[in-house]
Amino acid sequence: RPEMEWLAAQLGDRFTVQDGRFTDFAAGDAVYRFFELFDLANVPNASRILELAAAETIRLTPPPKPVFEEKMLFALLWNRNLHDFWRRELGEKFFQRLRQAVPYTWLVDPAPLPPHAALPELGLTDWRQLKTLSQRDRDLILKISGFSPRAWGARGVYLGSDLSQPDWAAAVERALADFTESPFVLQRYHKPARVDAQWFDFDRQTVVPMPGRVRLCPYYFVTGDREAAGATLGGVLATICPADKKIIHGMTDAILAPCCV
């Protein structure tokens, strides 16, 4: 909330930050949703906001589309059964380009495989065999898919090569046990690039250099109505964590900065 209040103040009187009980919206208001869909029961005015958005009385962003809050979409991109669908919907060129950017992703489903079958790319016949992989072979990362209070801030992220064997085994077991309520995905871990960054220390009034690792998050906005609607790149957020951090998120030690597009 402090960050949003600061941002609204920089933008002028047209923008205000309201709490979870505010319902006095006016027709045509643009509302930024600063809560996730898993948290609807804890946001008193959430149902009112969604009702007004459905009636097109207000413009709501991000749109309340659960698919965009689930990482398992990445696993569906790699699912061979859906390749024809993706080619038809995305086009062959963009489909291949997207697969170059998205790491191979598996949905961790505890359903038993036939004795002669194996998990694609992994060569394992049971998810529990992940637990016995050597640290060198555990260059894999488990992530809770979404729709959970553990799905942000790296709370539900487990990097195999960074954990002891017992801790990694416990993470695998938890992922299997939580499948019906909070599914996990497994991805190959790609080490983020190292960059030289700087941040401004307001206490010392000086610029401080910081070697770090960066994550880029593009923000797309839908403009136009109905058939004329299209996605437009609105900006890119760079999150730069200290170089010794292996999982990038908006931690207190991170630099969060807009990028030039």
Language-model features: locations:
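Domain-scale recognition of functional cores that engage charged ligands
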Residues: 1-261
